Amino acid sequence: QVGWRVSADEISASLDVNQAYWNGDVDGKGCVVPKQKAYHVAKPYDASYECRSEMCMLMEEMGIPIKYHHPEVGAAGQFEIEPQLGQMSKMADASMMIKYIIHNTAMKYGKTATFMPKPVYGEAGNGMHVHMLLLKDGEPVFSDDNGYSHLSKEAHYFMGGLLKHISSLCALTN
């Protein structure tokens, strides 16, 4: 459950999941996920498996191949769906379809999806992140064993470009 309040003098958000450790065993089923222990939990602790599987099936039907999906390390209810790597412009379009599918499928299951980057204090972050691989002649461009942090000059320029234009990118990327 996600809620928010916006008024002239206050902005707040709330997030709750029945299986979260802070709720105790509210539904009496004994399936509370301990703090920082949700990573790859199996059913019955993975209460979002059916919903997440349907999301992935719909993504596949829309031409977005999925590498895997699983519960994430943070609080109960956080999960990761990783699409296969693909051509950047195609994946940029796919990211919008992915968010659309996630929001609507969550609603179908009586849940609320959020991409808030840090919804719960003291827990692992949430939100949407991307994996990027830049190739030239079939070889990765970002890696350089002799470069600072094992990154190539191109990788540093790429990250610098993202940082320089991040305000504009955020305005366009939801």
List PLM regions with ranges.
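Glycine-rich, acidic/polar active-site loops that bind/position phosphate-bearing ligands
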Residues: 1-174
